[in-house]
Amino acid sequence: MQTDFISYADSQMEYEGYAAFDGAVTTRRPGVLVFHAWAGQDDFARVQAEKLAALGYVGFAVDMYGKGQRGNSAQENNALMQPFMNDRAMLLARAKCALNTLQHHPQVDRHRIGAIGFCFGGLCAMDVARAGLEGVRAAVSFHGLLGAPVGVPGGAKPLHTKILALHGWNDPMAKPADVVAWANELTAAGCDWTLEAFGHRGHAFTNPQAAEAANGMQFCELANRRAYAAMEDFLHETLQEKLSGAPSAKMGACPTPA
């Protein structure tokens, strides 16, 4: 496996992403953005990129905050994240910058892109999907925030990016009413969306460091394993098919209701 830190920039600042891929493969392959949680790009996000590389993708751990900008406490993490919660247009612009970087990677098929994210990163992946960006076929949210952006134009309807939300039903940051609102939003957009909800699970169930059950944040090995299996199947279905357009009937496709 080959791994590289990749510097990229926009008009605001410089960022440092992390790419992982099988260097022995010479053909272009799908790329998957990995959006980090509220602390910034860390070992957890980079490991996810490496796991994706082992599955045959180019994994790219995104840097949403800027090179070297990381949080070391809940207060610092929130200070880094909150500006993006207040300005979802800025969030999408940063995500687009990372997407452009991945799509220009020499190992990547720019027309077969996925996005996954954890917590805050789940929201980032969801906003990329909502925008209907060219080449982005799939988005997966792990215990992500679900609220729709305000004042940010969505993609053309029907939304072409398929979405999978892996959600702890007891997540205090995405309550049942939020889930219903999210489902209604995506249904109205004509999106092919899937929700897999894990009963008795809360926030951060994929993070081995999460151990605050009283606050609704607790790692769960079983839910983690099931969620990753669902992600693998979803990405294989959406990214490994080289032909563009609607999936064929033999793949079990169903028409999206008008």
What is each model feature region?
Residues 1-258:
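N-terminal cap/leader regions of alpha/beta-hydrolase-fold enzymes
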